[in-house]
From Swiss-Prot:
EC number: 1.2.1.38
Pfam families: Semialdhyde_dh, Semialdhyde_dhC_1
Keywords recorded for this protein, A-Z: Amino-acid biosynthesis, Arginine biosynthesis, Cytoplasm, NADP, Oxidoreductase
GO terms for biological process, alphabetical: L-arginine biosynthetic process
Subcellular location: Cytoplasm
Lyase listed as a keyword: no
GO cellular-component term (any): cytoplasm
Identification of the protein by name: N-acetyl-gamma-glutamyl-phosphate reductase
InterPro entries to which the protein is assigned, alphabetical: AGPR_AS, AGPR_type-1, NAD(P)-bd_dom_sf, NAGSA_dehydrogenase, Semialdehyde_DH_NAD-bd
Major localization class: cytoplasm
Gene that specifies this protein: argC
Function according to Swiss-Prot or TrEMBL: Catalyzes the NADPH-dependent reduction of N-acetyl-5-glutamyl phosphate to yield N-acetyl-L-glutamate 5-semialdehyde.
Catalytic activity from the UniProt record: N-acetyl-L-glutamate 5-semialdehyde + phosphate + NADP(+) = N-acetyl-L-glutamyl 5-phosphate + NADPH + H(+)
Family according to the record: Belongs to the NAGSA dehydrogenase family. Type 1 subfamily.
């Protein structure tokens, strides 16, 4: 069986490391090159002993033949590299936000930079397989969704698609600390984060336009108003989103659950649960657990969704996209089940 060759640009962040962990046991793909300027010259297995089977040198740029390149650089640092990678025949999956938004001015407004290659924004495919599978299959460039948007969009997409709710939603989301990256800050160091929960970027979080953009496409072009309020909670990984929207007409709890079951019936990584899910159900897996429920008294739909922010919210979804692009079974290398306790 042919093995495709993959490379990771910036393996040293949490998303890059999670990619390496997943690809280490992928039966159809060989991780052949990894970069990371801060650790260039070291072996990956020496710098991160838990990746003991990956005896690869960390280099400053990708080396050798690479079929598919994963970009795991911080926002705005990698966009200018993509045209060169594409010109060399590589297919690219970018885990940053650099190609998620379609409107170039939004990058200046929300990310503070002018996009260096806006001509690629129209070509880039938003990599949420449950909604864009056919486009992903033929894409040269896939924009891997953000962690919060993955949870929020999967939770609300059936309701918008089936016109169950008014185009006005609230998404209240809680994330583990790994979502803020490996670089220590006052928000994520132990003494500040332990035994503490805080909201941040209320109404100004840069994932908000991404959520709105994709839900508007699901809803037939109607641009929804989404109030997004993220929180940091003292756990290492996981996202739990609670979404609220007013129902357009009366509907029973079981009718809503059946709509969600039908919408996701063929999806390997989405499960509609009978009870509100826990983030620990998703730990280390590519699963998204969703619990829709009707608040009949207030005529609202409430949807609870949870994912592992580093897997379905980043590296696992990137590998899922890669599998689709390479014509592999979608769940290849992604069949892990969460470990409890």
């Amino acid at each position: 069986m042919k093995k495709y060759k993959a490379g990771i640009i910036n393996v040293t962040g949490y998303a890059g490391l999670e990619l390496a962990r997943i690809l280490a046991s992928h039966p159809s793909v060989e991780l052949c090159s990894v970069t990371g300027r801060s650790l260039a010259g070291k072996k990956l297995s020496d710098a991160f002993p838990y990746l003991h089977s990956l005896d690869l040198p960390i280099t400053e740029s990708l080396e050798g033949e690479v079929d598919i390149a994963f970009m795991a650089l911080p926002h705005k640092e990698g966009a200018s590299l993509v045209p060169d990678l594409l010109s060399k025949g590589m297919r690219v999956i970018d885990i940053s936000a650099d190609f998620r938004l379609k409107d170039p001015p939004l990058y200046q407004a929300w990310y503070g930079f002018e996009h260096p290659c806006p001509e690629l924004l129209a070509e880039a495919v938003y990599g949420l397989p449950e909604l864009k599978r056919k486009d992903i299959a033929s894409a040269r460039l896939v924009a891997n969704p953000g962690c919060y948007p993955t949870s929020a969009i999967l939770g609300l997409a059936p309701a918008f698609k089936m016109d169950l709710i008014e185009p006005n939603a609230i998404v209240d989301a809680k994330s583990g600390l790994s979502g803020s990256g490996r670089t220590p800050t006052a928000k994520n160091i132990f003494c500040e984060a332990s035994e503490d929960v805080c909201a941040y970027s209320i109404g100004t979080h840069r994932h908000q336009p991404e959520i709105v953009q994709e839900l508007s496409l699901v809803g037939g072009g109607v641009i929804p108003r989404v109030t997004f309020c993220p929180h940091l909670v003292p756990m290492s990984r996981g996202i739990l989103s609670s979404a609220y929207a007013r129902l357009k007409q009366p509907v029973t709890d079981e009718e809503v659950k059946e709509i969600y079951r039908r919408f996701y019936k063929d999806e390997p990584f989405v499960k509609i649960t009978a009870e509100p899910p826990h983030t620990r159900y998703t730990r280390g897996t590519n699963m998204c657990f969703i619990y829709p429920v009707v608040d009949a008294l207030n005529e609202r739909l409430i949807v609870i969704s949870c994912i592992d922010n580093l897997v379905k919210g980043a590296a696992g979804q990137a590998v899922q996209n890669m599998n689709i692009m390479l014509g592999l079974s979608e769940d290849t290398g992604l069949k892990a089940i969460a470990a409890l306790p």
